[in-house]
Each structure stands twice: as structure tokens, then as C-alpha cells.
Design a protein with these regions (language model features):
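Short, charged, solvent-exposed linker or helix-capping segments at domain edges/interfaces
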Residues: 207-210
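Short, well-structured alpha-helical interface segments that form or flank functional binding sites
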Residues: 62, 66, 169, 192
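C-terminal edge-of-domain segments
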Residues: 188-202
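Short loop/turn segments at secondary-structure transitions that flank enzyme active sites
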Residues: 149, 203-205
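Short, hydrophobic/π-rich interface segment
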Residues: 132-189
Length: 210
């Protein structure tokens, strides 16, 4: 039996807390089980021959679509708000974890090179993206995503309204770093020509090796 993707106390805990308050713990467990079953159906319904990098993105889209379409049957007016609340909490927790990591010697200097490497490997052609790099220095990294599989997959899964949530996750996590500034002016999911991405090391720490 496949490991459950969703638990009531996992990354979607805020959503399930709302369900518990509205309908009780038993209903929350029922919806959780239905969401896991929906995920298994979706993830195996298409794109079964993807490489591991692209498969990771497909799985994330299926996960989001599964819980959204399941909860929507019960709480159509609230589901999107509850999902976005869960995404915000998860992103802020990720930012807090990154801020703790930045306290270790040398990590601030390594962060931008790591971001650039991740953008090329995880968010490059192997993952189904088309991106274009701009300015890359020790102080800042700029790149644009011109084609995004999240937009494609969410349309295929008939949930295009979930696309912007993936973009907001960047803002929650990278936009709340203590030592770096995240800048973005547009995204593909909200009708932009690209997803622009700029991560800049704050001036107060430029030149430091820590």
C-alpha cells in the first residue's frame, strides 16, 4: 500500500483544522482518506514516463488537485482559501528554517550559488521548464521562467485556479528571508509573459563571507 500523501496533521493541517471545526474530526479523516485515493488516481492517470525531476513537479500538481477537488465537494466556498492558508503557513515555516540555516558560517555566501544551481537543475528543461538567466553575481541572481509545467499540468487536471498558489509559495518562503530580498513583478499563472525571479543579498551583508 502506498504511503499516505495527506495526513490531518501534515502540511495541510490548517485546512483540516477548518474541516474539524466545521464538520468534526471524523469528517476530516474521511476527507483525508478520499484525498489520498484521489491522488493515487491522478498521479497514475498520465505522464507515467517522466524523468524523476519532471515527475516531482507532476506529483506536486496531482497532490494539490487531489485535495482541492476532494474538499471542494464538501466546502466549495472555502476550499481555495483554506488551501492558500496552508500554503502560507508551510512557506513561512520554510523561510524560518532557511533563516536558521543562514546562521551557520558560510551559508549566506553559498545561498545564491545554490539557488542558481537549483534553478538550472530542478527548474530547467529536465523538469519541463524553459528558463532564461540574466544577471548572476555574488550579490544577486536573476532568471525568468518562460514556460512552466505547473501551468500546463493544472490545466490538464482542470484546476487552473490553483496555479497562482505555486507562485505565492515563492513569496512566502523566499520573500521572508532575513538576509536576502526576493523580487517579482509577474507570473505566468496570473497572466504574465513570464515568471521573473530576482534574489538579492541585502546590502548590509554584501562583502561578508558569512
Amino acid at each position: 500500500m502506498a504511503k499516505a500523501v495527506f495526513t490531518t496533521d501534515g502540511s495541510y493541517k490548517p485546512l483540516f483544522d477548518h474541516i474539524k471545526k466545521a464538520g468534526g474530526a471524523d469528517l476530516a479523516e474521511k476527507i483525508c482518506a478520499e484525498s489520498n485515493a484521489a491522488y493515487e488516481r491522478l498521479v497514475n492517470s498520465d505522464h507515467t514516463n517522466l524523468n524523476n525531476t519532471a515527475k516531482m513537479h507532476w506529483k506536486q500538481c496531482c497532490e494539490r488537485a487531489a485535495i482541492y477537488t476532494t474538499v471542494r465537494k464538501y466546502y466549495p466556498e472555502s476550499v481555495l482559501e483554506w488551501i492558500n492558508e496552508s500554503l502560507e503557513k508551510f512557506g513561512l515555516n520554510a523561510a524560518a528554517a532557511l533563516n536558521r540555516i543562514m546562521r551557520f558560517p558560510g551559508m549566506k555566501a553559498l545561498f545564491l550559488p545554490i539557488m542558481r544551481s537549483m534553478a538550472k537543475s530542478m527548474f530547467g528543461s529536465k523538469g519541463g521548464f524553459r528558463n532564461q538567466f540574466g544577471l548572476v553575481t555574488k550579490q544577486e541572481v536573476h532568471f525568468d521562467i518562460l514556460e512552466c509545467p505547473y501551468c500546463k499540468y493544472m490545466k490538464e487536471l482542470d484546476c487552473p485556479e490553483l496555479g497562482p498558489g505555486f507562485c505565492k509559495s515563492d513569496e512566502y518562503s523566499y520573500g521572508n528571508l532575513r538576509d536576502f530580498t526576493f523580487e517579482r513583478t509577474q507570473t505566468l499563472a496570473i497572466g504574465g509573459e513570464k515568471c521573473d525571479f530576482c534574489m538579492r543579498r541585502n546590502s548590509s551583508i554584501v562583502g561578508k563571507t558569512t
